[in-house]
Amino acid sequence: MKYDFIVVGSGAIAGSIAYELASRNLSVCRVGSTDRTNAASKAAGAMNGCFGEITSGLLASEHGKLKLNMDCISKALWPAWAQRLADSSGDTRALFTAKGTHVILNTAGMEEIDSVNYDAIEQTLNEYAAPYETVDPREIEWLKPNDLVRPLRALYIPDEHALDSHLLLEKLDAALVAEGGVLKDENVKSVLIEDGLAIGVELLSGERLMADKVVVAAGAHSLDLLSNIPSVVRQIPPIFAGYGVSILVKMPKGRELPTSVIRTPNRAFACGLHCVPRGDGVLYLGATNILAEKPRSQALISDVQFLLGCALDQLDINLHDADILSIQVGNRPIPADGFPLIGECGVNGLWLATGTYRDGLHQSPLLADYVANALTGIENTQINLDSFNPVRPPLVGFSREVMAKETVQQMLATGYEYRWDIKPYWLPLLNEGMTRNYQDLIESLHPQFTPPPELVAFSYIYESMRERLRSYYEAWS
């Protein structure tokens, strides 16, 4: 059988695109292992983060503001999307597990990162006339941090909820099949290209599936499936794995869960410390973010220790008697310039929908509609994502002049969250040394193109990252 569309991947984006296409009475086969080992979606806290995700860096460029607009549109789509999934799947279990989001500004971070990002969140809420209220952090129920890192300010965003990512993926599977789609529980080896046209995929088993068009939404693994078109892949921002750890814990009997998301602003290259109630006494704790040379399948002891320490310190000192149910590992897809890869990619009939970093699950309803419209010739009137076409030179977030400084600040923020204790006169020495090292690295990569701060920091460690960046930059020089 030849399908209208093959969608490669089993995360929230792939599942949503496949479901949307099937619901339009098109023949669709979604290909990807449904155990979703190490997928970002499965390990996600699944916050409907929009304003809570804002950083000063996001607002520093028009491309960053476009990502914010994607988040805002997506947030408005979720109630109807959740109802559609319930209707199609027949699964009426409540998808949302948290009501609203508390953003806390505590003393575990540093002024140049935490305070600046907290102010950016509040300023943008005001600019968008979005609902929120300032609250006394002492009045946030459930929150019982160590006094040394207690929050000094807090705000509540009433319409930024969170959902159960595991249940979402189950509903997407069931909804696809109910709408007539085919679910192939096997991973893809490569996309098949013939005479400059995508014609299908080859599975790891050797089986071949054919389609008029192929959408690759396989997260951090997406570009690995295009190895037979190296001249095209070389012009696409390479995707790096943002390895992250999250933990599910079971609270002791009689102990209540928070009713909202509780989170800090984004800091130290990560998405901020956060907890999300999952119901039935289960609490989600997240999340770390370490750029790795390749996707990881197991959590490091150091990252588990760090996350648990932060949760005990900054959220609830009584968490020590909770049971650990699961240590989850996910790999976020992080493009070389930090911006999504959405659109046809140099081969007729071949589309990419990945590179969304930590926003993919939240943006999945929007991306499903956007990609389905584009694939079927329907004009997208809500938003234009042409600038995120995968075949592109690097997009600019932070200016090159401040990149080394921003990288140093994020690295120092990591130290503060570890509760380091160093002599004050060491700070200027560390600052000067790291700034010089990072600036030298930036200059050595390319005279014009500059990676975002997290890639500056981790490519300084890994030669393989530097090689991939240089190869991509050379393609556009």
Question: Which stretches of residues belong to each language-model region?
Answer:
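Helix-rich C-terminal "cap"/substrate-channel and partner-interaction subdomain
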Residues: A374-S477
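Dinucleotide-binding Rossmann-like beta1-alpha1 core, especially the glycine-rich loop
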Residues: M47-E139
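C-terminal catalytic lobe of FAD-dependent flavoproteins
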Residues: D316-Y418
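Helix-loop-beta segment of a Rossmann-like dinucleotide-binding subdomain
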Residues: T92-M110, I121, T134-E179, T288-A292, ...
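Helical element adjacent to the flavin cofactor pocket in flavoenzyme catalytic cores
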Residues: L155-L204, L209, K213
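Active-site substrate-recognition segment that forms the wall
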Residues: S16-E20, R24, S33-T34, K42, ...
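Short hydrophobic core segments
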Residues: I6-V8, L209-S222, A368
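N-terminal Rossmann-like FAD-binding beta1-loop-alpha1 element of flavoenzymes
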Residues: Y3-R30
